[in-house]
Amino acid sequence: MPAGDALTKVASFEHQVTGVTVSKDGRIFVNFPRWTEDTEVSVAEVKDGKVVPFPDAAWNSWRNAKKGEVSAKDHWVCVQSVVASPDGNLWVLDPAAPAMGALVPGGAKLVEIDLRTNQPARTIAFDETVAPQGSYLNDVRFSPDGRTAYLTDSGAKGALVVVDLASGKARRVLDGDPSTQADKGVTVTYDGKPLRRPDGRGVEFAADGIALSPDGRTLYWQAIKGKTLYSLPTEALAEGVTTALMPTALADKSLSGKIETVGENGPADGLIISRTNGRMYITSPQDDSIKVRDLSAKGGATATLIKDARLRWPDTFAEGPDGTLYVTTSRIQDSAFYKPDAPAALPTDLWSFKPAAPDATGSTRPAR
């Protein structure tokens, strides 16, 4: 396969994109976290390669300078993820922590948008027992029956969050568990050098990538500053959110004992399990690549599917109705977090590619 043919550019953006999702009828949605005040649109639909504020301009009108004027509970504050649920609606995860800093009171939420009307259907607000200061709710997956949502928190103290969608009740679990924390023994690098902020801190993101098996029985997650992929039966998590008979510390200890180590991915951001072939796809920011894992081979190694210099910090995956996979590039290593002179508006892209063949070893595009 000629270099570069594996990727197709879907859209280009003026700002840093993270999340992407594709609805059952093929509509593409993306989000732009408020990592700089220059972010004008938080959630958008991509139409003919152009960004259209979603559900409307009003929901996208929150600004740091307007905290006292615009309510954080019914406007996008700092959206990190958009995901289409099995029933066809769009869910938007807003950690409400601009620049990954202080959480805006009343802003942390999970919002469902009815794609038949393009109007918000309900909002599940998270209080500080679920999203405390220092948290950064990162990504979300939904059970096939539409009853449960599973979230990662990549903030100062990693955790998972389980939401009962019928009641709106949420519970923070595995808070501080080694599986959800940044791995102190791992240093995230780029171009062969440790990626560090001006104050010397490295990449410290905790539980970030999350994936759910097609049958909904197994949840997978991993920290970016980590190398290990973990899993847990969702049955155990469901017990934790529907009952409050056990103190949190004891419940987490019980859950921790059920966690399995799947294998090592190296530092990774986005995870997805394809409906087409059941394989897990992994974004690898350190080397501009997408990797693939056969989950039936427990403990097996990953294979590099695509290595391409244009995948500058491959971030989040989505799968279209026809099985096409999509991935965003967020260029985190080029952002003001690590380069103080970085422009406020950092161009990024959305790409698509085909699922891996069973024996695929990938294609490469030389660095440039």
What does each of the following model-derived ranges do?
Residues F29-N64, M100-P105, K109, I113-R116:
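Beta-propeller domains
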Residues F13-D25, G68-N89, L93, V130-A149, ...:
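Beta-rich, blade/repeat-based domains predominating
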Residues R116, L165-A170, P178, L232-P247, ...:
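Short loop/turn segments immediately following beta-strands, especially the blade-tip
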Residues V43-G49, G106-N118, V163-D164, G168, ...:
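Beta-propeller blade signature
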Residues V30-T36, H75, V92-P95, L151-G155, ...:
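Conserved beta-strand positions in repeat-built beta-propeller and related beta-rich domains
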Residues A318-R368:
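Blade-level signature of beta-propeller repeat domains, shared across WD40, Kelch, NHL, RCC1
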Residues L7-V41:
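Beta-strand-rich domains and repeat architectures in extracellular enzymes and scaffolds
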Residues A6-T8, V51-D74, N118-P132, A170-G200, ...:
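Surface-exposed loop and turn segments in beta-propeller and other repeat-based domains
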